[in-house]
């Protein structure tokens, strides 16, 4: 019995020594480290330019119109930052009246070579806009739809607002601009 206890004691002691040796070996061959990574995003800046057909700035106070008029208005967007980006614009119709609608009162001649109108209501520039570049015109004229604008619109102010969004193209691969990641919610 004494010999059996001695054998068990020897086996337990051997197991403890093997465990301690293995842990020491693992500690000797492994290490734990800490790294801090700093990620900085670039700033995206753009400018919307509106011109008349003769190249002068579109008047801030707007123009007087009558139904059926075609107004010369050229809208361009400039990349005014140091990063290339994808670009989209949205046209927002407005009127200073609660009773009348501004829906479908404007008809634009979209530049379909450089821009694509998508079902989400945004018009996407078909390529990456590099720093310092300016887009081709989104459109060059606006028609006031005569069938929609009647005498009830006399004295009212109609507005066509151009809103633009951009997301960086660096590290944001996409086959088409509308597939890029990071567009703000509409």
Predicted regions mapped to residue ranges:
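Surface-exposed, hydrophilic segments of mature proteins
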Residues: 18-22, 28-186
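Short, Lys/Arg-rich N-terminal segment immediately upstream of the first membrane anchor
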Residues: 1-5
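Sec-dependent N-terminal signal peptides of Gram-positive bacterial secreted proteins and lipoproteins
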Residues: 6-25
């Amino acid at each position: 019995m004494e010999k059996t206890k001695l054998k068990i004691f020897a086996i337990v002691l051997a197991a403890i020594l093997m465990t301690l040796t293995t842990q020491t070996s693992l500690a000797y061959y492994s290490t734990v480290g800490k790294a801090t990574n700093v990620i900085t995003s670039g700033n995206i800046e753009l400018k919307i330019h509106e011109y008349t057909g003769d190249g002068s700035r579109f008047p801030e106070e707007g123009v007087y119109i009558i139904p059926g008029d075609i107004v010369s208005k050229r809208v361009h967007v400039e990349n005014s930052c140091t990063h290339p980006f994808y670009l989209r614009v949205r046209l927002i119709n407005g009127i200073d009246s609660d009773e009348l609608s501004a829906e479908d009162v404007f008809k634009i001649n979209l530049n379909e070579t450089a821009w694509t109108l998508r079902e989400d209501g945004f018009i996407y520039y078909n390529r990456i806009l590099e720093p310092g570049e300016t887009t081709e015109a989104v459109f060059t004229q606006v028609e006031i739809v005569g069938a929609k604008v009647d005498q009830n619109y006399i004295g009212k102010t109609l507005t066509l607002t151009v809103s633009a969004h951009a997301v960086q193209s660096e590290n944001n691969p996409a086959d088409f601009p509308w597939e890029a990641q990071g567009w703000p919610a509409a």
